[in-house]
Amino acid sequence: MEDLAVEVRGSNGAYYKGFVKDVHEDSLTVVFENNWQPERQVPFHEVRMPPLPDIKKEITEGDEVEVYSRANDQEPCGWWLAKVRMMKGEFYVIEYAACDATYNEIVTFERLRPGNQNKSVTKSSFFKCTVDVPEDLREPCSNENVHKEFKKAVGACRVYFHAETNQLIILSACESTVKRVTILSDMHLRSIRTKLMLMSRNEEATKHLECTKQLAAAFHEEFVVREDLMGLAIGTHGSNIQQARKVPGITAIELDEDSGTFRIYGESAEAVKKARSYLEFVEDFIQVPRNLVGKVIGKNGKVIQEIVDKSGVVRVRIEGDNETKLPREDGMVPFVFVGTKESIGNVQVLLEYHIAYLKEVEQLRMERLQIDEQLRQIGMGFRPSSSRGTEKEKGYATDESTASSVRGSRSYSGRGRGRRGPNYTSGYGTNSELSNPSETESERKEELSDWSLAGEDERESRQQRDSRRRPGGRGRSGSAGRGRGGSRGGKSSISSVLKDPDSNPYSLLDNTESDQTADTDASESHHNTNRRRRSRRRRTDEDSSLMDGMTESDNASVNENGLDDSEQKPQRRNRSRRRRFRGQAEDRQPVTVADYISRAESQSRQRNLPKEPLAKGKKEKVKDVIEEHGPSEKVINGPRAASADKALKPQTTERNKASCQDGSKQEAILNGVS
C-alpha cells in the first residue's frame, strides 16, 4: 500500500500521510496511518502526491522547507511548512510559517526536506479498473496476497476485492495499467482457481497425514478380498462399507480397488473385527457323500434352501463331475458356498449335522432290513419286505411301513392269498396266515380250477364278503383276510372293479356301519354292502384260494334247490354276538420274533397230522355256522362256537375241501347237510 500513499492536508495546514482506498468522482477514500483518524472521503484539492523518494536534499539558509513535526502529543507527525533561519553543522534553526506567532525550533537534517512542489490531485491523477469475479472465486479473492503477482505484473498501485459489488478493483497512477488488466484478468482468475484446487488438495493431504499418524497408533486390520467377490464385499451402492463404518469405534476404512485390499482402523479390537465380518467375503467348499447328495438337496431344493437361509450364505454351487478346480475325494461331491466367514462357519455346522443325521437314518434303515431278512429266513414270518426297487425312489424322510403300505408290497410268507400290505402285519393275535397249516398244494390246484369254472354271480357274492374281512392272515376266525376260514357272502370288491375298470375304486369305502369299532374278528357281522370297505388285493391266475374249490358245488346246490339269487336272499342277521365266543387269544397283540418262531414250530407239527381227520374237523365246524343269506350265499368259515338256542334258517353253508394227497373231490354242504 506504500504505492498508494498520499498526503492529506489537515485543518492546521500540515500534511499527514494517508493511503488511497478508492477513487470517486470528486474525492478520494483515504485511510490514515496508524488509524489515528477514521477512514473518510477527502476532496481532491486537499490531497497531493508525496515527493519522489530519490530527490536530493540541498538546503541553505533562507530556503523554504518542510519539517516533520507535530503540534502536540495527541497528534501524529506531519509535514509543516517552515523557513531556515540559520545553519550550524548538522543543526538547523527553522521558523514555522503556519503559526500565527513566530515559533522557532532547532531540528536535525533528517527531519527536513525541500518543499513539496506537487499540486493537488485530480480525477485524472488515478486510473481505476474493475473485473467481475465468479462466485466460486469470491472467497479466495478477498485475500490480497492472492493478487500480489497480478498487481506487480500490471503495475497497479492497489488490487483488492470489493464485497458489495463482487468485483476486483485495480487502482493505478499509470494509464498502461488499464490495458494490462484487460489482457491478464482472465488468466489471473484461472490461476486463482488452479491454486485454490491445489491448496485444497494440500489441506486434505495434510489432514490425511495427521489422521494416518493417529491411526498408526490405533487398532487396525488388513485383508484381501478376491476380485470376483469385491462386488459382494462393497455391497449395493457401498451398503456394506457404510454399515461397517457405522460400527461404534471405527475411525476409518480404506479400500485399494486395484489389489482388493481393505484396511480397517478403529479404537478397539472388537470394533475392528466386527467391521471386518461385514466386508470379508470368501468361498469355501464342503465334501458331501455322493449317495446323500439328493437328500441334502431335498425335494425341489427345500433342504439346501433352508440351510442357505439359516446360515446367511450368498449362494451355493454343486461341483460337477467334469470340473476339477477343487480337490475331490472318492465318493464325495463338493458343495461350494460363498459368503462371509461367519456365514461359511454357520453352513458348515448345519451341513455336517444334517449329513450325520442322514447317516444315522441310513444305518437304522439297514438294521431294519437285516431284522426283516432274519425274520423271513427263520419262520416265514409275516413281516413285510420293502418292494421299492432302489433307494432313489423314496424320500429319505418317508416312514418304512408307510411307504410299503402305499406300494402294496407283499409279505415274506408264501402260503395262502390272505396277505395284505405291510400295515396288516400279524398284529391281531392268532389271526395269522400260519393259523391253518392244513392246506396242501393239491387243494390249491383244485381251488384254482374251481374258481375258473365258477359263475360270475357267485364269484361276486364270494368276493363281496371277502372285502369285509379284517386284515390279519388266513386263520379260521371270521376276521381273517382271504384265508381258508374266510366268509363267502356278498359281492367281491375286486370283481366289481374288474368288471368296470373305469369306475371309482374308492367308492367301495363309502359305506359305514354302527359297529365299525368292534373287535377285529367281529367284522363278519356287517352287511354285505359294507363288506366292500376292506377289499382284497387283486388276484392273479397263479394265486390259489380256498373259495375257488367251492364254486362249482355251490352253483350246483343252488340249481338243485331251484333257488334264484335275486329272489331268496334273506336279510342277514347281525352276528356281532359271535365275538363273545371268541377267545382272548384273538385280541390284537403286537407280534414279536418269538411269535414267528412259535408259529413256525406249530406249523411244522400240524403238517405231520393226517389230512383226513383235518378235513372231517372242517366239516363239523362248518355245520355250526349260521348263515342267513339265500342259497347262493356261502357260509363263512367263522367261529366254531354258535348259539344253540337259535333256529337255523334255510341257507347254503360253505363246503370244505378235503386235503387228501390222492386228489379226492370236494364234498358240497347244502343247507347244513353234507
Swiss-Prot record:
Residues 353-379 are annotated as: CC2 domain. Residues 404-414 have a biased composition (Low complexity). The gene is fxr1. Residues 423-439 have a biased composition (Polar residues). This is RNA-binding protein fxr1. It holds the Pfam family Agenet. The keyword Cytoplasm applies. The keyword Glycoprotein does not apply. mRNA-binding protein that acts as a regulator of mRNAs translation and/or stability, and which is required for various processes, such as neurogenesis and muscle development. Specifically binds to AU-rich elements (AREs) in the 3'-UTR of target mRNAs. Promotes formation of some phase-separated membraneless compartment by undergoing liquid-liquid phase separation upon binding to AREs-containing mRNAs, leading to assemble mRNAs into cytoplasmic ribonucleoprotein granules that concentrate mRNAs with associated regulatory factors. GO terms for molecular function: molecular condensate scaffold activity; mRNA 3'-UTR AU-rich region binding; mRNA binding; protein heterodimerization activity; protein homodimerization activity; RNA binding; RNA strand annealing activity. Residues 609-632, 646-657 have a biased composition (Basic and acidic residues). Residues 380-674 are annotated as: Disordered. Keywords: Cytoplasm, Developmental protein, Differentiation, Myogenesis, Nucleus, Repeat, RNA-binding. Residues 474-489 have a biased composition (Gly residues). It comes from the Eukaryota. GO terms for biological process: dentate gyrus development; membraneless organelle assembly; mRNA destabilization; muscle organ development; negative regulation of inflammatory response; negative regulation of long-term synaptic potentiation; negative regulation of translation; negative regulation of tumor necrosis factor production.
